[in-house]
């Protein structure tokens, strides 16, 4: 039906007859002439109808926005005064000779001249996806997956599918459960990741595996999360962590070159401890120049418990954050930032405004200055590199609260005060994570997952001091987003059982949930390591959006609902009966519980 795409016509097509298919983006009547902007997935081209083609002109008068049409005509160059430099096709236009209205459109529920609500966009997603910016994002996503497949194939990786219906295993979030009709009372789980299957593939001898795969997590959603998401999943045998990072870094660098024409350069490597200490985050945005600076040693003897308490506590921390030009912040804004850090557990936000350093104590403004000597203030200003016009904010609490609060404040100030250089790309690797973290109930939980190997520890050493264990894990971070994460896996049964034990999984539960894995580890398991990238987040970065729903064709809301299809929906009672499931209404359930 078509010979060319609208958005691909150029001056090289001048003089050619073409047939286009697409939608009316806009119509303009200029006396005896009618112009339309015709759109398809590749872009927009101007088409005009003149009196010499009376039938086409008459039919064109019926056109309205979003009519689906076919146009045959001749490409010609625009007069110089009419060239539109803002359009890729702005140097040409199509003189229509034939017009077919394939399908008419009713008045649209979306307004192309105004910003529509996200609710409306998701309800009429098929219309929203016609917008050029949305089409471009999905084209970029397709380009990314095409590149990844080529790269992986060139490097000897095999694309192997793993099951969608599997067994529920604890991986940190709730599973989506699928009831079995054949095995009544039993449930499959949709995979949170192909983690165990890809490890089993390594045990099977497939030493380089990858898959672009859907994963599912039934968790409370945030703006950058979806209940179903896509991973670029990778696993290798007989490769060390640095070797895995090297090949994956090469892939991402080539991807950025192909999609953005940008060389990211060699990725710096930073330990988890350094990232938390300097940036208050394990995924630091290095485009932001501000850093957290430890000042506890300067404040141990001050008569101000807010500072002295954490400064003298081995589990405490006092850190300063210098904000260039921050002295201009109003009291109202300072109070707002004080309330902001309370979200992260901080009790408030002490500060020093630096107006004129040369005047000493007279050159600063601070509600805590009365507790500090001139020497201490000068030492703080020196250590933070403060200059006239700067602001210094303080965090004083346990180490986690200080890192979380000042880390979040750093990001917010970077955005609010335009201190973060949005034109830059700042990738890095973060390594050497703690293997375990406090679960808040006196136990430990795996920081990554329970199949991650410790670094340079035997099973006995791990059992004796699990809180000291460093995971042989690594995350790739770009502009403050964790785009990929992985680790060296446990390949010995004794170590795997030790980790399960530390996590409070007894031997019976180990056999019930992971018996197949423990059995597989008995038969010559090779050392293996891998990584998974979030395709959605990669696409967000490469298309310049901060909304994950902008890069997924048919996403869910933050309530895990599809407004277009109205999923989830109630199931047919007969189908539930076949599954042996009975829905208990809330009122009936409450009545039963009261009994």
From Swiss-Prot:
SUPFAM superfamilies xref list: Class II aaRS and biotin synthetases, GAD domain-like, Nucleic acid-binding proteins
UniProt-annotated binding residues for L-aspartate: 171, 217, 448, 489
InterPro entries: Aa-tRNA-synt_II, aa-tRNA-synth_II, aa-tRNA-synth_II/BPL/LPL, Asp-tRNA-ligase_1, Asp-tRNA-ligase_1_N, Asp/Asn-tRNA-synth_IIb, AspRS_core, GAD-like_sf
One Pfam entry name: tRNA_anti-codon
SS bonds (residue pairs): none
Residues spanning the signal sequence: none
Annotated localization: Cytoplasm
GO biological process terms held by the UniProt record: aspartyl-tRNA aminoacylation
GO CC terms of this entry: cytoplasm
Binding site for ATP: 217-219, 226, 482, 534-537
EC top class named in words: ligase
Gene Ontology MF terms: aspartate-tRNA ligase activity; ATP binding; nucleic acid binding
Region (Aspartate): 195-198
EC number: 6.1.1.12
Keyword Nucleotide-binding tagged: yes
Keyword terms: Aminoacyl-tRNA synthetase, ATP-binding, Cytoplasm, Ligase, Nucleotide-binding, Protein biosynthesis
Catalyzed reactions: tRNA(Asp) + L-aspartate + ATP = L-aspartyl-tRNA(Asp) + AMP + diphosphate
Function, as annotated: Catalyzes the attachment of L-aspartate to tRNA(Asp) in a two-step reaction: L-aspartate is first activated by ATP to form Asp-AMP and then transferred to the acceptor end of tRNA(Asp).
Similarity annotation: Belongs to the class-II aminoacyl-tRNA synthetase family. Type 1 subfamily.
Quaternary structure, from the entry: Homodimer.
Name of the protein: Aspartate--tRNA ligase
Native source organism of the sequence: Klebsiella pneumoniae subsp. pneumoniae (strain ATCC 700721 / MGH 78578)
């Amino acid at each position: 039906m078509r010979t060319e795409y609208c958005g691909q016509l150029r001056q090289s097509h001048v003089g050619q007859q073409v047939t286009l298919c697409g939608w009316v983006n806009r119509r303009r009547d200029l006396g005896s002439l009618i112009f339309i902007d015709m759109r398809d997935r590749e872009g927009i081209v101007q088409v005009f109808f003149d009196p010499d083609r009376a039938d086409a002109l008459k039919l064109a008068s019926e056109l309205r926005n979003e009519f689906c049409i076919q146009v045959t005509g001749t490409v010609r160059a625009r007069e110089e005064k009419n060239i539109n430099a803002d359009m890729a096709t702005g140097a040409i236009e199509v003189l229509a000779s034939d017009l077919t209205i394939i399908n008419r459109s009713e008045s649209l529920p979306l307004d192309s001249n105004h910003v529509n609500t996200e609710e409306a966009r998701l309800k009429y997603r098929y219309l929203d996806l016609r917008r050029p910016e949305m089409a471009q994002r999905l084209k970029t996503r397709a380009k990314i997956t095409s590149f990844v497949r080529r790269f992986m194939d060139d490097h000897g990786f095999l694309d192997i599918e793993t099951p969608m219906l599997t067994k529920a295993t604890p991986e940190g979030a709730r599973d989506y459960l699928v009831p079995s009709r054949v095995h009544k009372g039993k449930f499959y789980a949709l995979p949170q990741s192909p983690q165990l299957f890809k490890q089993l593939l390594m045990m099977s001898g497939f030493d380089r595996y990858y898959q672009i795969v859907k994963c599912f997590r039934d968790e409370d959603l945030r703006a950058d999360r979806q209940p179903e998401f896509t991973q670029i999943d990778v696993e290798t045998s007989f490769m060390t962590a640095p070797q895995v990072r090297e090949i994956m870094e090469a892939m991402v660098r080539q991807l950025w070159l192909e999609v953005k024409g940008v060389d990211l350069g060699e990725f710096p490597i930073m330990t988890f401890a350094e990232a938390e200490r300097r940036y208050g985050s394990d995924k630091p945005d290095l485009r932001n120049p501000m850093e957290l600076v430890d000042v506890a040693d300067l404040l141990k003897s001050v008569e101000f418990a807010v500072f002295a308490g954490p400064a003298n506590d081995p589990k405490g921390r006092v850190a300063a954050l210098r904000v260039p030009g921050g002295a201009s912040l109003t009291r109202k804004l300072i109070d707002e930032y004080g309330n902001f850090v309370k979200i992260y557990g901080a009790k408030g936000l002490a500060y020093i405004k630096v107006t004129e350093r040369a005047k000493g104590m007279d050159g600063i403004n601070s509600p805590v200055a009365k507790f500090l000597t001139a020497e201490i203030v000068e030492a703080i200003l020196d250590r933070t590199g403060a200059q006239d016009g700067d602001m210094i904010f303080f965090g004083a609490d346990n180490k986690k609260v200080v890192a979380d609060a000042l880390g979040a404040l750093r990001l917010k100030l970077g955005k609010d005060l335009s201190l973060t250089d949005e034109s830059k790309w700042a990738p890095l690797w973060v390594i050497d994570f703690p293997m375990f973290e406090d679960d808040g109930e006196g136990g430990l939980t795996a920081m990554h997952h329970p199949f991650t190997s410790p670094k340079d520890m035997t099973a006995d050493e791990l059992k004796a001091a699990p809180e000291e264990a460093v995971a042989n894990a690594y995350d790739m971070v770009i502009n403050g987003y964790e785009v990929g994460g992985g680790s060296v896996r446990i390949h010995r049964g004794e170590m795997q059982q030790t980790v399960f034990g530390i996590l409070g999984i007894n031997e019976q539960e180990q056999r019930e949930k992971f018996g197949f894995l423990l059995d597989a580890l008995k038969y010559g398991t090779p050392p293996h390591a891998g990584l998974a990238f979030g395709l959605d987040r990669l696409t967000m970065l490469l298309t310049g959006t901060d909304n994950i729903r902008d890069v997924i064709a048919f996403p869910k809301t933050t309530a895990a609902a599809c407004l277009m299809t109205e999923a989830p929906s109630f199931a047919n009672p007969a189908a539930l009966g076949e599954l042996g499931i009975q829905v208990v209404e809330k009122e009936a359930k409450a009545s039963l519980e009261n009994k």
